Amino acid sequence: MPKVAVYNVSGQKVSEMELSENIFGVEVNEHVLYEAVKNQLANKRQGTQSAKTRAEVRGGGRKPWKQKGTGRARAGTIRSPLWIGGGTVFAPKPRDHSYTLPRKVKRLALKSALTSKVNNEELLVLDELSLDTPKTKDMVNILKNLNADKKVLLVVGEKNEAIIKSASNIPGVTTALVNTINVYDILNHDKFIITKDAVEKVEEVYA
């Protein structure tokens, strides 16, 4: 069973915590992680890319010159894809790129992502995190105490506007709730900081 240190907001180790083997100690499946990230990025795509085919470009209905006798290559329209201002071959059209990933695959990917953070010593547990009023400076000091100076994903057990607003102005810092964490965000951040109560909720929800 994985065991990690628990820190306070001053960066001092206050205790240790055993994590669930079923969530934070699984075998990391890189292929499943790849599929989950690919799925998330595909679902984010707007799918609004569009270009005109030769049939859709305005003009070009008249043959630019006669077929024979000019010495030029034959041409039937000035909107051929070979011409400047012509249509696009196999022009992209708006479409929905999203697709559904099986629930079991999503669960396994999330567990693999969390396990990878534990294995790489990039997961950090806080005994508690609470702010009465939004203050970016306080959040900066907390992260500094925890040596979290790069991209940080901060996960809390309950929604706290003061914490969210305090972290929102810090470059590279993202806040999330237990039910909103995802594989891409976990892997895309260097540090995964989670409160003790949030760990308990993760183990309860994803067990």
Curated annotation (Swiss-Prot):
GO cellular-component terms in the record? ribonucleoprotein complex; ribosome
Q: Name one GO biological process term.
A: translation
Q: Name one GO molecular function term.
A: structural constituent of ribosome
Polar residues: which segments have biased composition? 43-52
Q: Does the keyword Transport apply?
A: no
Q: Is Signal given among the entry's keywords?
A: no
Q: Where is this region: Disordered?
A: 43-72
- Pfam families membership: Ribosomal_L4
State the protein's purpose: One of the primary rRNA binding proteins, this protein initially binds near the 5'-end of the 23S rRNA. It is important during the early stages of 50S assembly. It makes multiple contacts with different domains of the 23S rRNA in the assembled 50S subunit and ribosome. Forms part of the polypeptide exit tunnel.
What NCBIfam families is this protein classified in? rplD_bact
Quaternary arrangement and interactors, per the entry? Answer: Part of the 50S ribosomal subunit.
Give the UniProt family note: Belongs to the universal ribosomal protein uL4 family.
Protein name (Swiss-Prot/TrEMBL): Large ribosomal subunit protein uL4
Q: Which organism is it from?
A: Alkaliphilus metalliredigens (strain QYMF)
Q: Which gene encodes it?
A: rplD
